[in-house]
Amino acid sequence: MLSKLLRLGEGRIVKRLKRVAEYVNTLSDNVEKLTDVELKAKTDEFKQRLADEKNPESLDDLLPEAFAVAREAAWRVLDQRPFDVQVMGGAALHLGNVAEMKTGEGKTLTCVLPAYLNALAGKGVHIVTVNDYLAKRDSEWMGRVHRFLGLQVGVILASMTPDERRVAYNADITYGTNNEFGFDYLRDNMAHSLDDLVQRGHSYAIVDEVDSILIDEARTPLIISGSADGASNWYTEFARLVRLMDKDVHYEVDLRKRTVGVHEKGMEFVEDQLGIDNLYEVANSPLVSYLNNALKAKELFNRDKDYIVRDGEVLIVDEFTGRVLIGRRYNEGMHQAIEAKEHVEIKAENQTLATITLQNYFRLYDKLAGMTGTAQTEAAELHEIYKLGVVAIPTNKPMIREDRSDLIYKTEEAKYMAVVDDVAERYEKGQPVLIGTTSVERSEYLSRQFTKRHIPHNVLNAKYHEQEAGIVAVAGRRGGVTVATNMAGRGTDIVLGGNVDFLTDQRLRRRGLDPVETPDEYEQAWHSELPKVKEEAGQEAAEVIEAGGLYVLGTERHESRRIDNQLRGRSGRQGDPGESRFYLSLGDELMRRFHGATLEALLTRLNLPDDVPIEAKMVTRAIKSAQTQVEQQNFEVRKNVLKYDEVMNQQRKVIYAERRRILEGESLQQQALGMVRDVITAYIDGATTDSYVEDWDLDALWSALGTLYPVGIKHESLTHADEDSECDELSRDELLEALLIDAQHAYAAREAELAELAGEGAMRQLERNVLLNVVDRKWREHLYEMDYLKEGIGLRAMAQRDPLVEYQREGYDMFMAMLDGVKEESVGFLFNLAVEAVPASHVAPVEIPEGFTGLVADVEAIRPREEASSALRTKDIDNESTGLTYSGPSEDGSTQVQLNSGGGQKTPAGIPVGASRRERREAARRRGRGAKPSRSVKKR
């Protein structure tokens, strides 16, 4: 219903965009007359008009002229002139909408127009793609247009150094993947120097395949983590146990909800095997998680469908695209359970150091827009989460593809035999065929069947995705047969007769030409080679059209209608003929999860042979209903992820703002003195809770304060015994005032001591380093605590409490306690940290520490306002660097992990190898408490 309401004003928006395109057309004649130099000069003219102090123009004012200029530049450079519908799409993107443009309508070229316009403001434009290949390709291909107009274009790739990233972000337009943009944001907020920052703000982003990135991948947060412990023997032990357990005897499985439940008989079996009395005793509670994960690994995660095993490593397969997600690992011990199941090396679990969801990352942008071929089914979610409207842009030519009704077979074997027969028939007449499967296993099974029938074909799946662009580019040629695990986010058009741009680029690269390295030679060769390729491809395209165009054959319905529509959408681009059909069976996962028994009963009553299909509207309705249910479930999951992350998001904003303030060189003297005041006040409040002065344990208070700073007064001097009482009445306020004055004197003495040691401004330098390192360490500990809290918060529902409300309340309490801890530890370090002077020229660059291993001062990195003649260095610090792990949504699917080398991984002191999360948490708490002076100083 909400989707329908959101579409009510769509017609008016499309009419408005059409008027924009018509106005741009009226400017075309004048723009065409400009020379190349004059066309390029328009960029500087537009910038001056934006910056005019007397009568500045807005980007909206410049839109028609800027679009006309960019359109003409695209024609001169690429031999491609954006159609009116592409101009409409560009205007929709500039206005902050999602432009729904069907496959083959030229989304990549459309993006050039709003990117050029918004780059004129000088704040940077980020263009987000689904993988590194597309980011590099588009930055080179479309970057030719922008460079022709005098703009700088950068690209962010996973392999780049921070210096290379900084250059790319300083360009006018920056291409990259959602993961790279997000991880750079997190890394910037882990940096120890302004010089380490790479991003320069979040002004405007255009997200390609916006539904894939903002919807499908939104369930998976971006996480930077470090090693937390070694592998546990419990994973292996429970993998052995569950192999001995029987489904429906020891445990039950719900495929629809993807859950497992252990029966009483199963618990007794595990208890007998482990020799324990009660699995659910507090001491044994970590074992329950191992058992549940082992059962899920056995029943819910299937080899060659959900993951593959390659070179002794478990690699996750993306459910949406069928690609291998190199390095991706499930959280909460799930990946270790699968490794134990497959008898491969069990790798250590990680501890979160920084995290953000894609929803909250993209909401950082002042303006956000996106492009996709399928967005209407998700219009409500895009509006609710991101405040993005969806505008359906008309196709340039009418769609004439024929979408055939589904064929349903009783068995999977009969279905696949029918698929092979159909493909063989199409191949004989020269019609190209694209077959979509949902798993690597199915694609390889079909490949073997085609080989038996001597049908030449290409396989495009998780195991061979390196060659995917080349395979897709020729998938529309005569007699081409392509088997693909899924077609979401492939990024290369299937053009009848072959993709002309790709084939031309391929030929030029074989000759050693590159659009970035050798731009002049490349441009010259492009214009001479392109007509030849067009002529060759045009002749073949005519033959393919005669044969019926591209035939898309789906072998299974996906749980998302969008993925099905994306597969269909590969055929019938730009008014070409085409055809699509889905072959289904009762063994398909969607059928088994929803209404499988009903459909099987229907086929049994009809008494049809296995190889005879049925076409029934009832089945189509059942499938649509099932897909709608799954989509709604996934929407609820994503909303739930966002609700929980919103708690962290508010806390993250506070911490990141504080870090940035420290980095940017503001004087922290008043803040440090404020911390001293707050901590001493808290100690005194803890010591004076008893109403009678004689009950105060001032000796304990002085002892505790002595661990913070060198106390210069004795409490005896504050009290004077007389004849009538043990001591004069001493008020809490008098005690506080005396100690605060004493602490201020001690702080001034500490500052003088450091000034003598390392020169004027040394104390400011120490303040900056102490606060930065303490904030980082306490924030990491807090993330760990919040992970643990969220892990078990769902159990609060059993006590009739809302888990989200409980998470918000306890998360807030933990955050405030963390801030108190930051103050307490910072004060202790400021007064007591042993430092030495080091000539500034000999100071090594500061490395980002894995944990709180020390405070390293660096004049250049920290940039204090008052320069010290020498740098400060803490003594007896073991600087340990540990490799970081980057976990987030895959390039165009669910999740991936990227490892960053950085020294040997060590288990933190005091934490046993193989420790459970609960054990690690308690050890971390004990370790953290060791450095803190106790506040409990009341007299007993």
Swiss-Prot record:
Family: Belongs to the SecA family.
Biased composition (Basic residues): 923-940
Enzyme class: translocase
Predominant place of localization: membrane
Region feature (Disordered): 867-940
Protein name: Protein translocase subunit SecA 1
Gene3D superfamilies found in the cross-reference section: Helical scaffold and wing domains of SecA, P-loop containing nucleotide triphosphate hydrolases, SecA, preprotein cross-linking domain
